[in-house]
Swiss-Prot record:
Coiled coil: none
Assembly, per entry: Homodimer.
Gene: bioF
Residues annotated as signal peptide: none
Name this protein carries in UniProt: 8-amino-7-oxononanoate synthase
CDD domains recorded: KBL_like
Required cofactor names: pyridoxal 5'-phosphate
Length: 384
């Protein structure tokens, strides 16, 4: 089989399964509205959960940062790319979340890959929730350590896997809020079992940070759990992009020496760090509380109105509200029907989710209004 035949076969298989991904160029894709092909849609696919991507205070901070620092960092943080803006953001994040140190990364994917690649050796074991993000599972699969997966949120199965002999260290990996189901991990129980077996806990709280808990401190804070490794990202609740790893001082020093994604990547622009500092200030303020309260009310309104639909509504109290459709083609058809009625919704299919669980991944944000939720419900009920 030639290279071209190999590529064609893979693409043909995706097409046959109604699983071929595609991108849509949009003129505006975050916030309440999505604009594509000169048409405006109510946007129920954005991860901008607090509606901060267009916040004037954050935009102003980015502009001022660009004027002060330029539009790029100029290099890796180990060379010339570690700005005083980066340092200030790291210190503010660490203080906010109760850790000694924070290290910035260009994306959540890079942060997860870097930590696992740097921490794990051949004699070690990763025990991951089987619904963990692709960045976590891919890094675990590529690492020299053993990978075992436990049934989603099943602490008993986790304990059984941890109890089996392991010559090295054990790292338990899970998410705070799961990206495709919107449910939360039982972190207190997971941490207890992990500690009983002398393991460390790594939590990716991409979809909880900024959105859940006191001052938006996230799922771990809400459940009174402090994992050894906490990954937070800035493309969701913060409305920007990037990520950080929260950890002890010694672990931070270790990652600075051995995390290749950190060492060999150009740092995020200092202007972006300034925007993130402004976003954090909003998240921690009374305005942040008001945005979280509004989002919670929108979620309650949606869940109350969707109960009698012929789909499975995932058990989620988060901004992620998946409607499990099952069949790939049916999910695509339903997403297209919603778009025709002015609601932009994305169909999520395997391999992103397990086979037979294709879904509409609906996301609600604080930028929405109650009438937007009512319109979505009207269309879902076939009255659009």
């Amino acid at each position: 089989m030639s290279w071209q035949e190999k590529i064609n076969a893979a693409l043909d298989a995706r097409r046959a399964a109604d699983a071929l991904r595609r991108r849509y160029p949009v003129a505006q894709g975050a916030g309440r509205w999505l604009v594509a092909d000169d048409r405006q849609y109510l946007n129920f696919s954005s991860n901008d959960y607090l509606g901060l991507s267009h916040h004037p205070q954050i935009i102003r901070a980015w502009k001022q940062g660009a004027e002060q620092f330029g539009v790029g960092s100029g290099g890796s943080g180990h060379v010339s790319g570690y700005s005083v803006a980066h340092q200030a953001l790291e210190e503010e994040l660490a203080e906010w979340l109760g850790y000694s140190r924070a290290l910035l990364f260009i994306s959540g994917f890079a942060a997860n890959q870097a930590v696992i690649a740097a921490m794990m050796a051949k004699e070690d074991r990763i025990v991951a929730d089987r619904l963990s993000h692709a960045s976590l599972l891919e890094a675990a699969s590529l690492s020299p350590s053993q990978l075992r997966r436990f049934v989603h949120n099943d602490v008993t199965h986790l304990a059984r896997l941890l109890a089996s002999p392991c010559p090295g260290q054990q790292l338990v990996v899970t998410e705070g809020v799961f990206s495709m189901d919107g449910d939360s991990a039982p972190l207190a129980e997971i941490q207890q079992v992990t500690q009983q077996h002398n393991g460390w806990l790594m939590v990716d709280d991409a979809h909880g940070t900024g959105v859940i808990g006191e001052q938006g401190r996230g799922t771990c804070w809400l459940q009174k759990v402090k994992p050894e490794l906490l990954v937070v990202t800035f493309g969701k609740g913060f409305g920007v992009s990037g990520a950080a790893v929260l950890c002890s001082s010694t672990v931070a020093d270790y990652l600075l020496q051995f995390a290749r994604h950190l060492i060999y990547s150009t740092s995020m622009p200092p202007a972006q760090a300034q925007a993130l500092r402004a976003s954090l200030a909003v998240i921690r303020s009374d305005e942040g509380d008001a945005r979280r309260e509004k989002l919670a009310a929108l979620i309650t309104r949606f869940r109350a109105g969707v109960q009698d639909l012929p789909f499975t509504l995932a058990d989620s109290c988060s901004a992620i509200q998946p409607l499990i459709v099952g069949d790939n083609s049916r999910a695509l058809q339903l997403a297209e029907k919603l778009r025709q009625q002015g609601c932009w919704v994305t169909a999520i299919r395997p391999p992103t989710v397990p086979s037979g669980t294709a879904r509409l991944r609906l996301t609600l944000t604080a930028a929405h209004e109650m009438q937007d939720i009512d319109r979505l419900l009207e269309v879902l009920h076939g009255n659009g």
